Amino acid sequence: MASVTALIIASIVTVAHGQTIVHITLGHNHTLVGPPITSEVIWTKLGSVDYFDIICNKTKPIFVICNRQNLTLINVSKIYNGYYYGYDRSSSQYKNYLVRITQPKLTVPTMTIIKMANKALENFTSPTTPNEKNIPNSMIAIIAAVALGMALIIICMLLYACYYKKFQHKQDPLLNFNI
């Protein structure tokens, strides 16, 4: 067991040298091909809770199928991200993978895109103005309230300009008119 651990630690040093980067879509299965075998390939996931985990003996948190050479990742999720290392005990050959999980791309059919573009062009080229029957009552009420508010503000400004000047005895001949 000590020789296996020493082999794994020595191999960790060379992980970045010969790694293959694999992008797997979320929810799919993927097979990692191991090195040529003389006995059996042992698969480990580097960087887990224990520095390395022998994953063919486990069922959680990742589900895999191991045969003598290959490792199949089942129903891939985000926890499958990481370095996978397969080595043959007898021949000291190894394969390592950097697994990255990607989100599936949502594709819109081209016919839908064309229909959406045509609809947008129709709306853009022929703007419709609502006739008097289609104008909602709330819109009329809002417009009336805004007009009334503006009128009140103007009246208040005129009253202030006229009466404030009279009370301060600074009458301006242009503002001096009787209401």
From Swiss-Prot:
Keyword Zinc: no
Family matches, as InterPro entries: Adeno_E3_CR1, Adeno_E3_CR2
Disulfides per UniProt: none
Glycosylation sites: 29, 57, 70, 75, 123
Pfam families to which the protein is assigned, alphabetical: Adeno_E3_CR1, Adeno_E3_CR2
Keywords: Early protein, Glycoprotein
Family per record: Belongs to the adenoviridae E3_20 family.
Role according to the record: E3 proteins seem to be dispensable for virus growth in tissue culture cells. They are potentially important for virus growth under special conditions; E3 region may help adenoviruses to evade the immune surveillance of the host.
Protein name: Early E3 20.1 kDa glycoprotein
